[in-house]
């Protein structure tokens, strides 16, 4: 079962927040923004409940997220949440490899690249504008 980690979000400029307070934003908002930046599939959407919880954050002037999300979050949203065991994933992967050999070769090379790239990712999201910055 894929584990989801919440990135720590610091709100700057929100009138009701003290300077030393740190707020946690639901994973859905961060993943929604990362889908444009980091190449997640466009159909990977967060549940409506998560987005409703983040509604009060739209009043903030700036939203800064610093942290890195594990690779299994991308796999979780790319293939659907709710995998119960590794056997189901192996069976589905074996079926895909048998059907499309080139796709499995690309998946293996992508996994090798991901294993070699474990540097923490730092990203900054600014609410209310199209400015987004992704630094590795």
Curated annotation (Swiss-Prot):
It comes from the Bacteria. Keywords: Nodulation. This is Nodulation protein K.
